[in-house]
Structure formats: structure tokens, C-alpha cells
Amino acid sequence: MKKIFKYMIVGLVACTTLSSCLESSLDTNPTDSMSGSGLLANANAALVPLNGLYRSMYSAWSPTDNTHQCFGISAYNLMADVMGEDMIMAAMGSGWFWYDCLYNVKSRYTATTWRSYDLWNCYYTWISNANYILDAEETMAGTETEVNYIMGQAYAIRAYSYFMLAQSFARTYKGHEDEPCCPIYVEPTVAGTEGKPRSTVLETYAQIMNDINKAVERLNGTTRKHISHIDYATALGLQARIALVMEDWATAKKSSEEAIAVSKCTIAKVSEFKGLNSVSAPNVMWGAEIISDQSGMYAGLFTHMDADADKYGAKARKQINKDLYGKMGTEDERLVWWNPKDDNNKDGGYQQEKFKFSDIQTWMGDYVWMRIEEMYLIAAEAECRLGNDAGAREYLMDLMSKRDASYSCAQKSGTSMGKLTSDYTGSLLEEIIIQRRIELWGEFGRIYDIRRLKQGFKRTAEMGWPTDALLVNRNANDPESYMWVLTIPQTEFDGNSSLDQTKDQNPVGDTK
């Protein structure tokens, strides 16, 4: 029996530039509608489907009914942040992201309106788009540099998508290499394409590394046309992220250092990127420039974050773990990212002010997906893991000198980490991770770090967590838990005869 492949190519014939893409442009057509003699005939024409693919990364394009929490990369980063201990949801509000926060989505894998289907469908849609672009390389007209620019981005998008699938539907890489991960497709898929079995974690990461290495190679020497495009520096940043999860410290160091060297971005003072809503800030490596007809309105990041806008963010306030807030010095400029004096804080944590609309009336604000500060934190961690504490401290101080004039990590050393994220050891590695938690709060997806660091965590009322979200009698303290491994959607089992639901489904509960 053949798999009736449901992942679609984004329909973008009418979308010639990022700024002209409208919501209606995101209707999907079957993958075989993209002809090599048409949109992919030459590198210049290929920018149309490529731009549309990026457009879907910040749009409420999801076929599910829960589009207000399904708006691409920023939505999934927010999802992964509320799954940890640092970003507090003070209340259920309208319900968006609340069930992620409570770990109450895995049993809903039969519905197309919940996370399992949403993430699986999203990432495989991006993979399908990338595969169609990559398949056109031999016939695509253009200079070598022009074709490399298209192909390098397609490889990077496929690498990123499989990387996020691996982080969502399998346990972390190290120690789980032989466990099942996800099916791998590297060629265009159409109705009737035979489904693949789940590859192992090791096989999936081998594909990820193969793709991101090719992306880095192909993008080197090209010039980015738009901030939403993955360029050479951004591909290096993605390579560094992947290497961290694989505990390949040498690659993490090399890639992050090269990204710092070639990106032309600089560590920015907090005052230079207020609201985290502009891709024009000097520290932004990759992001989505939002224009008025692409704001997403209620299906957008700032709607969920900016409480002053009196939208979803006011009903379900995002606040920082008080314990983490207390790790900042009195002169730390990042203190302004949270407001402990907000009258609406009540019994929760401290109200976030880090993410703000640039214009509330028009729902405006760009999405930032990678900052240069992350590269310094990766380089610091990699140096520390490699035993070079002096080098690690230097990278950390490069960042912290722009955050807190009185900061010092001179006495920190070593790599010891507590079993729980709240079990502090005082090591240099722990200090780097603490600063990472503060610096990237709301941007990266905290649960991904908790997984790769193999720590458990807890939520307490003292941190500011509401009673309903304390995760009582759950396995959050066990780093080997399946609590944060999503179930595969029922639609995949219904359409893919290579999968056996009795053997291939991930545990619905916290343990296997």
C-alpha cells in the first residue's frame, strides 16, 4: 500500500516578493504542481517559492483550527519555553499554549487541531518544499553563485526541519542514538509516494549534519537578499546549535566563532533592541520582517506576549521565574525585561516587558529568530566543555560587559551541573547556562536545553508558578522522561503503511 502523502508545496505563483505575499497566497497546492520548467526553471524565479516557504515560517498557515498558537517558528519557540521552568504562564487565559505548559497534549494525537499534528505537518511541509527545490538543481539555470544561494537555503531549511522534528518526537541525541526518531524523505513527494519507516536518532542526525554541512558550503560566498533568508552566517549558527545537541563541542566552537566573524552583527546594548521587535537591530542574524498585511493579528507572537496591548498576553501573562530573575545583578540592564512592580502581577512571577509590539494599533513587530549573542554563548559553552575555562570566560565577558558593568566570572571554573536545574553547583558551565537562560528567555525554547543538558526541573509557587501549573506527580525531575516527547499524529499511521502504531507510537504517558 502506498502512502497518500499529504505534505504540500506552498502555493506562491502570485507572490513575487516577501513584501507582496498576502494571506491568500498561503493556500496550498499538491507538490507536483511545482514544475521544473516554471517556478524552478532558473535561480531568480526560484526565489518566489523560496520566499513563500519563508513566509509560512511566520504565518498562521496551519491547517488546524488552533491557528492562534500555530504561527511558525516563533510559536514553536514559545511553546517550548512555556514547557520549562523559566517562563511562567500566570493563568490559562484563552487557552493558547496553556496545554503545552501543562503537558496535556500528547493524548490528543488523533486530532488535527493539536500539537502532534501541527508540528509534524509543519516540519514535513517545509521538508517537502525543500526537496522540490533541491530536486531542480540539475535543470535550474543561473550562475553557480545564484544556484548555490537557492540550494544552500533549501539544504538549511531541510536540516532545520529534521532537527526540530528530532527534538520534538524523540529523546535527545546523546545516549539515545539507537532509538526511533522520524521518517526521512530527501526526494520530492506526491500522492502515492511510499511512506518511510522511522529512522533512528543517529540516522536522523546524520542526515541533519549532511544537510547543514552542504548548506554552509553552498552559502559561503553568496550575498543575502533579505534578512528572512538563511545566509552563510545563519547556516553556521544552525550548525552550532545542532552541534550543541550532539555534544560535538569542537564543531560548536568552530561554527559559532565563524558565525561571529562573518555575520557583521555586533552584541547590542539592551537599549538598542527594545521590544525585540526589529530585525534592523545590529545584533539580529536572522528573522522575519513583518509588514502591515502580514501581522497575523491574534495569531502572532506579540499578541501572546505584550500584556499592555490588552490581548491574549494580558489574560495569560508571561512572567519570569523569580529564582532566575534573582540571578541578575543590580546593575544588569536586562532587569528592564521584566517588571516586578506591575500591578497585575498579583501572585505570579514578574511581568515580561522584553517582547513588545512596535505598533499596537497595527499589530506590528518583527520576529527575531537568531541573535549574535547566542553565538557568544555557544562559543563560551563549547570552550568550557573542551576544558578551556579562560576562553569560555572571555566569550562570556564579551556578552556580559554589555549587560552588567559590575559582572565578573573570574572565579568560575569547571563543568559540574545539578541533577535539577535548580540544584546549583557554582561551576563556570552552570554560569554560562544561567546567562543563556536569561539572555534567550522567550526566544529559543527552554525545554530543548533542559533535554540536551539531561537535567530535570521543578516548578514551585515560590518561583511564581500558579497552582494549576506545578506539574504535581509528573516526571519533570527525570531527564530520561518521555514527558517532553510528542506522540506521532494519527494521520501519519493512517497514511503510512511502513509504520505500526503498536510499535512506532511514542508513549502517551511520561514513561515507556
Residue ranges and their predicted role:
Residues 31-37, 64-84, 90, 171-178, ...:
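Short, surface-exposed recognition loops and adjoining beta-strand edges that mediate ligand/DNA contacts
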